[in-house]
Amino acid sequence: MLPFKTLALFLLTAVAEIVGCYLPWLWLRQGRSAWLLVPAAASLALFAWLLTLHPAATGRVYAAYGGVYVAVALVWLWTVDGVRPGPWDWLGVSVTLCGMAIIAFAPRGG
């Protein structure tokens, strides 16, 4: 799979997972409507389906996806929660994304 397509799929997958977890959090912690569980379930189903679109071995996909998830969660923290990440947050996500790139795009023998 091409690197751009892989990254786009990882980004979409991360957003689906975060939305699927954030909506129940709103219901449980902020007293929002239980109807939020309906789009949350749909979002988590989309998340699971998106994971199946990656051609690599499942464990490798999960490991590489985890790096993108960390980056998207940090952006979510900033844009949705209104908490600006600090320099250590950005350094941590940079290291994580380097690891993701190695796992996802390193040449594989055989």
Curated annotation (Swiss-Prot):
This is UPF0060 membrane protein Dtpsy_1668. Keywords: Cell inner membrane, Cell membrane, Membrane, Transmembrane, Transmembrane helix. It is found in: Cell inner membrane. The lineage of its organism: Bacteria, Pseudomonadati, Pseudomonadota, Betaproteobacteria, Burkholderiales. NCBIfam families: PRK02237.1. The keyword Transmembrane applies. Its main location: membrane. GO terms for cellular component: plasma membrane. Belongs to the UPF0060 family.
